[in-house]
Swiss-Prot record:
Its cofactor is Mg(2+); Mn(2+). Its EC number is 6.3.2.4. The gene is ddl. Pathway: Cell wall biogenesis; peptidoglycan biosynthesis. GO terms for cellular component: cytosol. ATP binds at residues 167-222. This is D-alanine--D-alanine ligase. One of its GO terms (molecular function) is ATP binding. Keywords: ATP-binding, Cell shape, Cell wall biogenesis/degradation, Cytoplasm, Ligase, Magnesium, Manganese, Metal-binding, Nucleotide-binding, Peptidoglycan synthesis. Residues 134-347 form the ATP-grasp domain. Binds 2 magnesium or manganese ions per subunit. Disulfide bonds: none annotated. InterPro entries: ATP-grasp, ATP_grasp_subdomain_1, D-Ala_lig_Van_CS, D_ala_D_ala, Dala_Dala_lig_C, Dala_Dala_lig_N, PreATP-grasp_dom_sf.
Amino acid sequence: MSKPVNLVLLYGGKSGEHEVSLVSAASVLKHLDSEKYHIIPIAMDKSGRFHRHDYNDLLACSDKLPVVTEKSTPLEGLLINGRLAVDAKIVFPVVHGPLYEDGCLQGLLELAGVAYVGCDVLSSAIGMDKDMARRLACINGLKSARYKLLSWHANASERQQFCHEVASEFGWPLFVKPCSLGSSVGIHKANNMDELNAAVADALRYDEEILVEEFIVGREIELAVLENSIPCGKPRVSMVGEIKVNHPDGYYSYTAKYLESSQTDLIIPAQLNNSLEEQLKQAAANIFSYLKCKGMARVDFFVNDKTEEIYFNEINTLPGFTSISMYPKLWQATGIAYPDLLDELINLAMVHHNCRQHLVTNYL
């Protein structure tokens, strides 16, 4: 038997999605094969400090992983002298939100010369920005909800004018979203001007730019995409899943996702006609390719109830891995077990790392 690969499981972080990361990390830790990998859990607290854990100390943590314990060891940083602070060949990031999904972490790991799971700097940065992702995803005629952008730098008068303009153009209700955040953090459904003003103020607490979009009446659809292990092969796309929200919030809010998930139904496979299913799969594969994604992504759509018209919602280049997260659930239903999915993602990461290592960087 070959020697286990040293693998860092990185979780936590300075982000509004910190708690989600702890839950995802517990699920990944549970499904990683300890005979294949020597797992080194490293947590990042909300102040940005790193803490190393012993794998065996966390095995009993089934719901979420701790950030600091009596047995954890503080690290001076993730890197020391430009290299990873621990002896590991690959990093599996299970961190969400700005700094972690937007290319910053990916760039840091590339500078350190270490392999990492998931999308690279470019695709992570594009995918994290809802505006930029939509611009590229919709270049060939695919639609998204109409929206307008508002900057944190807008003064009170400009914000008020913006709110009146979007309400006049799009009507009610409206959705307010931070441009570069996930897990429905900072997202609000506004049914009137008072709610819109409050939603805008709250969303701007989380991001420098927000978008306000029209409400699309329709079904909420998600697909998981996995890079092909065959070089230049087409991305693999899972069967189609649907989210049905029965929560009082009226949409797939943070509360509906994680705190009161029993009021949300994840339907796999979604009940769609064959033509619509194929259109969605092709759209998901195309978007994965347009954004030059690597490893994995989850692509979300809305489908109009009456016309069956497809609207791109967003792409998540570092999707959740909790026990209720759609990405692993979709692949399990499609035929790839959770541990096998993790193995595939790690193998893909090693392939990309090996490619980068063979690039010429000396021009003399």
